[in-house]
């Protein structure tokens, strides 16, 4: 897996555009079953069109930078574990964006247009059902659909991954672990530890 650590807005010089890039964006804390549904779909889509997968993630976590519940925020996986899980799934390229307050002010449309399209030129962007991005989390699937027709890429939304009628999410796994309910966290995902 190729790993890039770009300054916000610019890809590092070692990242080379790939043909038929299948892209996703997110923090991917825990790389849980819901994330895996997105990532595995990407891997399959890339194989079908002889492309490569590109995951764009952020470090530090946006909540740490924006001070949203950051004092009690505990992560399911650290950065190294996340990278290992992404590599095991078969992701070809990982871009870790340095998340700063300045970067948090980039509008969702500008992020997709000036960063993702300009630097990666995706064939398709795949996101989860509840994914939001850009300033104040204003970007969503609807915006991606609008931009897709304008910039000629495909967009796909992966629906919630449910376990016993509960949509799997990093937040739900974290809350289970904070309560000491490792069994519930494991039900939502693979083995967790406290």
Task: Say what each PLM segment does.
Residues 2-194:
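Nucleotidyltransferase catalytic core that binds NTPs
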């Amino acid at each position: 897996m190729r790993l890039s650590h770009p300054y916000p807005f610019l890809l590092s010089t070692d990242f080379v555009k790939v043909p038929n890039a299948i892209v996703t964006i997110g923090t991917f804390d825990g790389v849980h079953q819901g994330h895996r549904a997105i990532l595995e779909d990407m891997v399959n889509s890339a194989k079908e069109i002889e492309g490569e997968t590109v995951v764009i993630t952020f470090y530090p976590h946006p909540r740490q930078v924006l001070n949203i519940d950051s004092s009690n925020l505990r992560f399911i996986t650290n950065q190294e574990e996340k990278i290992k899980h992404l590599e095991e799934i078969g992701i070809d390229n990982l871009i870790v964006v340095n998340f700063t307050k300045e970067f948090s002010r980039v509008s969702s449309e500008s992020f997709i247009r000036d960063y993702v399209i300009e630097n990666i030129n995706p064939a398709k962007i795949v996101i989860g059902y509840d994914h939001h991005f850009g300033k104040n989390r204003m970007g969503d699937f609807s915006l991606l659909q609008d931009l897709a027709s304008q910039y000629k890429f495909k967009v796909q939304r992966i629906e919630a991954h449910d376990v016993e009628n509960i949509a799997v999410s990093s937040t739900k796994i974290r809350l289970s672990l904070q309560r000491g309910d490792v069994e519930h966290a494991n039900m939502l995902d693979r083995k967790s530890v406290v």
